[in-house]
């Protein structure tokens, strides 16, 4: 199964007014992704997703130039060999670091799709798992900085649909953040309420919200600080009283090794389209398992990442939640990839049953939605 071609498709679409949620990183104005196709000489085709990295054209160019030259001609079944070749040439020395990890993630995911198709197995079975239900929480670019009453209007139909956990966006300021959390907790006393500050907090902000987080039984506080701010994570862990979560902006097992050893973060959130692909997130999950830590992956833009994430969670022993994207009008979820991943009435999701990722990509969609330049979030 020699790799014959690798092609990246940077793609974008503008968000609708109702989908422009405000978060700690700004207000969403467009959605970006980098879809990756790998073809073999014997006619197999695999699809993956690389995160946009807020510069999808850059990631696409890296895949279509340097990384293509590194992987074309190699054995598509040798995912470890391909991963190591890119690591040696780009990640170990003088490479583009995070951009390479992101680009490699899309290629790696496509190679696992090919491996599954070659043997006729869904990815979860290929990884040693089974078709088991994976608990989901309502997340994605949604549940942002709305007034409490409007936020409750968003949460109610999600609970009615079966979700037993939701993630609220905080990071505006301690007072309005706590007001939103209190409103949701008051109406839904048994709901697992998770919160995400999208790196917008200071240690003093965490100190101010900590009593409220404990009072309202918040399940985790996600990314209060940027990923490199190890000192703030260590400080907040001493007093916050709820688990700290992070990982969507950490790359490869080498960065997760420090995250685990520091001991401040108790919920790990690698992204299969950022952290190094399926291959690397399996390693991260094994590392976390040795420390008795759950893995709750961050999901990216399209149904490719979403399908791969559910497959992986159905195959690792320390699986946590699947982050279900409940944002409005996400064409990458609803039109680019099929079939969809419906949430079951009990708030779980089943992995696709088809070979590989078990989903199909609409190439006409990619042709109709070229990349849109500029930032995806504005303040």
List the model feature ranges, each with a label.
Residues 1-69, 311, 364-379:
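N-terminal basic, low-complexity leaders that serve as flexible interaction/assembly modules and, when applicable
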Residues 2-4, 8-15, 33, 107, ...:
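Flexible C-terminal active-site loop/helix
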Residues 3, 43, 67, 107, ...:
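Conserved, mostly hydrophobic/aromatic
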Residues 5, 39-118:
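Metal- or metallocofactor-binding catalytic centers and their adjacent structured scaffolds
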Residues 46, 136-139, 164-168, 193-197, ...:
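Hydrophobic faces of well-ordered beta-strands that scaffold small-molecule active sites
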Residues 65, 211, 217, 228-348:
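Shared catalytic-loop signature of beta/alpha-barrel
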Residues 104, 169-173, 198-199, 222-225, ...:
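Glycine- and other small-residue-rich loops at beta-strand/loop junctions that grip anionic moieties
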Residues 125-240:
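Metal-dependent enolase-superfamily TIM-barrel catalytic cores that perform enediolate-based chemistry
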């Amino acid at each position: 199964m020699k790799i014959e071609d690798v092609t990246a498709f940077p793609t974008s679409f503008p968000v609708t007014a109702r989908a422009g949620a405000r978060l700690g990183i700004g207000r969403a104005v467009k959605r970006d992704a980098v879809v990756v196709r790998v073809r073999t000489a014997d006619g197999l085709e695999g699809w993956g997703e690389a995160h946009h990295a807020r510069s999808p054209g850059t990631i696409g160019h890296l895949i279509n130039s340097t990384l293509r030259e590194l992987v074309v001609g190699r054995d598509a079944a040798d995912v470890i060999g391909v991963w190591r070749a890119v690591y040696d040439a780009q990640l170990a020395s003088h490479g583009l670091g995070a951009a390479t990890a992101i680009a490699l993630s899309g290629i790696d995911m496509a190679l696992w799709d090919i491996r599954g198709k070659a043997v006729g197995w869904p990815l979860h079975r290929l990884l040693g798992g089974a078709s088991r239900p994976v608990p989901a929480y309502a997340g994605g670019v949604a549940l942002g900085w709305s007034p409490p009453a409007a936020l409750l209007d968003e949460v109610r139909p999600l609970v009615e649909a079966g979700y037993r956990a939701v993630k609220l966006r905080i990071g505006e300021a301690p007072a309005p953040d706590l007001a939103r959390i209190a409103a949701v907790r008051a109406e839904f006393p048994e709901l697992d309420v998770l919160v995400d500050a999208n790196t917008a907090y200071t240690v003093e902000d965490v100190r101010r919200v900590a009593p409220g987080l404990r009072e309202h039984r918040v399940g985790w506080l996600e990314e209060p600080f940027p990923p490199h701010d190890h000192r703030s994570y260590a400080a907040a862990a001493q007093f916050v009283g709820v688990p700290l979560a992070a990982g969507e902006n950490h790359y490869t097992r080498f960065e997760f090794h420090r995250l685990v050893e520091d001991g401040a973060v108790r919920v790990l959130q690698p992204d299969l389209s950022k952290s190094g692909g399926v291959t690397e997130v399996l390693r991260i999950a094994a590392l976390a398992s040795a420390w008795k830590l759950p893995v709750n992956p961050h999901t990216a833009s399209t149904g490719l990442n979403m399908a791969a994430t559910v497959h992986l969670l159905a195959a690792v022993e320390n699986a946590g939640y699947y982050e279900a994207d409940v944002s409005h009008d996400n064409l990458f979820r609803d039109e680019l990839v099929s079939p969809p991943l419906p949430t079951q009435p009990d708030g779980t999701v089943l992995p696709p049953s088809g070979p590989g990722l078990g989903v199909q990509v609409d190439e006409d969609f990619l042709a109709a939605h070229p990349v849109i330049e500029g930032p995806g979030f504005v303040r």
